[in-house]
Amino acid sequence: MSNRKALLGKKLGMSQVWDENGFFVPVTLVDVSTNVVTAVKTEESDGYKAVQLGYGAIDPTKVTKPLAGHFAKAGVTPRRHLVEVRTDDVDQFEAGQELAADLFEEGAEVDVTGTTKGKGFAGTIKRWGFKSYRRTHGSHKNERRPGSVGACATPSRILKGKRMAGRMGHVTATTQNLTVVSADVENGILAIKGAIPGPKGGIVLVRSAVKGA
């Protein structure tokens, strides 16, 4: 296990900032303003070490009674999103503790996990990058067809994992080893170099890089 730190946040969109050499750096802005520790898991009580984080306000009347009791035990108002992060540094956290953007220092390497944009039902060319058929004489409505998908009498079926048309996107993805350009504690915003998964308004998890850089 590692000493990974984490924050839940909402993707606000992309911008650009100047670096010390006078170059524009593309950054993604992430709102991490309402993070709070809702539970601390220890070896003695739970069999493993982890910290549970809550993010985003929610109407208390829309929270189930078991969850309402969970939040009340932690001494925090109900939160819309919960996530649990494994870490060895559970002694540094306690239930009800608020976490700010400065949990990550400028220059820190992070992994960002989010849900990618959904593209709907897509064909094999868009979804998998298949080559289209030649657009010339003799071609009849074949330009974007996938071609043969199976064998003959043996194995008499299409093998699992065959790349075919289907729903594209809206899956969990992680972009690794991104750099924190700045941490605005007053406004609760992290500026992370580069692009991260998901649309504007999407919920993301920012964690210390597992592979380093």
UniProtKB/Swiss-Prot annotation:
A GO molecular function held by the record: rRNA binding
Xref: Gene3D superfamilies: 3.30.160.810, Translation factors
UniProt keyword list: Ribonucleoprotein, Ribosomal protein, RNA-binding, rRNA-binding
Any one GO BP annotation for this protein: translation
GO CC annotations on file: cytosolic large ribosomal subunit
Superkingdom classification of source: Bacteria
Function: One of the primary rRNA binding proteins, it binds directly near the 3'-end of the 23S rRNA, where it nucleates assembly of the 50S subunit.
Assembly and binders: Part of the 50S ribosomal subunit. Forms a cluster with proteins L14 and L19.
Protein family per UniProt: Belongs to the universal ribosomal protein uL3 family.
Name of the protein in its database record: Large ribosomal subunit protein uL3
Organism: Bifidobacterium longum (strain NCC 2705)
